[in-house]
C-alpha cells in the first residue's frame, strides 16, 4: 500500500466524523503538489559547483546526496555524484562519507602517501551502487573513532571503523569508511585531517540530519539536495515498482481522484 488516510474518532457523532474525514481527505489531495521533493539533477549540481569554483566571491556549497542516505536504508556507496564531479574536473571538494570497507582496508595496507588505482565498490553486487576506478593517493588513515561537534552527534562518540582519506584524481578528497552510516557531523570528515571550511564544495551522504552538524558553516541557501539513482531517492518515479495498484499519484501525474461517497467505519 502507498496511501494517505484520514481517520476521525468520535464516540457518537458518526455523520460529523464522516464529514470531517472527507474534508481532511480532500484537503490532503488538494495539497499534493506542495509535497513534491525539491531536488536537483546531477548536471545542475555540476553547473553550480563550477560557478562557485570560478568565482571566489561566491559562497561554498554543500550537496546532500539524498538518494543514498544510509539513515534511510541506502548503502552509502553510490558513485553517481562522485563520478560526475570527477568527469567534469571539479576540485576543492570533500566527499563524505563513502562506505567501502575493502577500499579502506587496502589504503591502510598501503600506507599514507601511497599512490594506487582505487577501485570503488569492488565487491559490491547492488546495481544502484555502481563501480568506479580512479587514481588515488592516501592522504590520511584513522581507526574511525571521533567525538561529534554539534547537532545529533554533539559531544557523542562515534565509530566509522577503519577509515581512509583518499584524494581521487588529485582533486576530490573522499572519506572511505567501514561501518556504514550517514554523515551527521563535520567530525566524520575532519577527524582524519580534512578541513571542511577550506573546501569550496562538500558532498554528504545524508538527507536531513546533517544540517544540524553543518549549519554553522553552511547557511540554508548554501545547502542543496541532489538526486541520483539510489534506494532512498525522494523521486518515487525512479524506483522499479512491482505489485503496485494503479493509478496512483505521483507515478500517474494526471490521475484524478474524488472523495468517496461512503467512508469506512471501524
Put a short name on every predicted segment.
Residues 1-8:
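Single conserved hydrophobic/aromatic residue that forms the stacking wall/gate
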Residues 29, 146-266:
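Extended hydrophobic packing segments that form well-structured cores
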Amino acid at each position: 500500500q502507498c496511501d494517505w488516510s484520514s481517520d476521525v474518532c468520535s464516540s457518537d457523532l458518526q455523520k460529523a466524523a464522516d464529514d470531517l474525514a472527507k474534508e481532511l481527505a480532500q484537503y490532503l489531495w488538494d495539497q499534493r503538489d506542495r509535497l513534491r521533493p525539491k531536488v536537483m539533477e546531477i548536471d545542475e549540481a555540476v553547473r553550480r559547483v563550477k560557478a562557485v569554483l570560478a568565482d571566489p566571491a561566491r559562497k561554498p556549497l554543500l550537496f546532500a546526496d539524498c538518494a543514498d542516505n544510509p539513515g534511510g536504508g541506502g548503502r552509502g556507496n553510490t558513485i553517481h555524484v562522485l563520478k560526475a564531479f570527477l568527469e567534469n574536473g571539479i576540485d576543492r571538494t570533500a566527499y563524505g562519507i563513502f562506505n567501502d570497507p575493502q577500499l579502506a582496508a587496502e589504503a591502510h595496507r598501503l600506507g599514507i602517501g601511497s599512490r594506487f588505482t582505487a577501485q570503488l565498490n569492488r565487491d559490491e553486487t547492488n546495481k544502484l551502487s555502481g563501480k568506479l576506478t580512479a587514481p588515488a593517493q592516501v592522504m590520511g588513515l584513522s581507526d574511525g573513532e571521533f567525538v561529534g561537534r554539534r547537532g545529533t552527534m554533539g559531544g557523542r562518540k562515534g565509530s566509522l571503523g577503519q577509515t581512509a582519506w583518499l584524494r581521487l584524481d588529485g582533486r576530490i578528497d573522499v572519506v572511505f569508511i567501514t561501518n556504514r552510516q550517514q554523515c551527521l557531523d563535520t567530525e566524520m570528515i575532519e577527524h582524519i585531517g580534512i578541513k571542511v571550511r577550506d573546501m569550496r564544495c562538500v558532498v554528504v551522504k545524508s538527507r536531513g540530519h546533517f544540517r544540524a552538524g553543518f549549519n554553522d558553516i553552511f547557511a540554508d541557501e548554501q545547502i542543496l539536495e541532489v538526486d541520483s539513482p539510489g534506494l532512498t531517492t525522494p523521486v518515487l518515479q525512479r524506483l522499479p515498482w512491482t505489485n503496485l495498484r494503479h493509478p496512483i499519484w505521483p507515478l500517474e501525474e494526471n490521475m484524478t481522484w474524488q472523495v468517496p461517497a461512503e467512508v469506512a467505519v471501524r
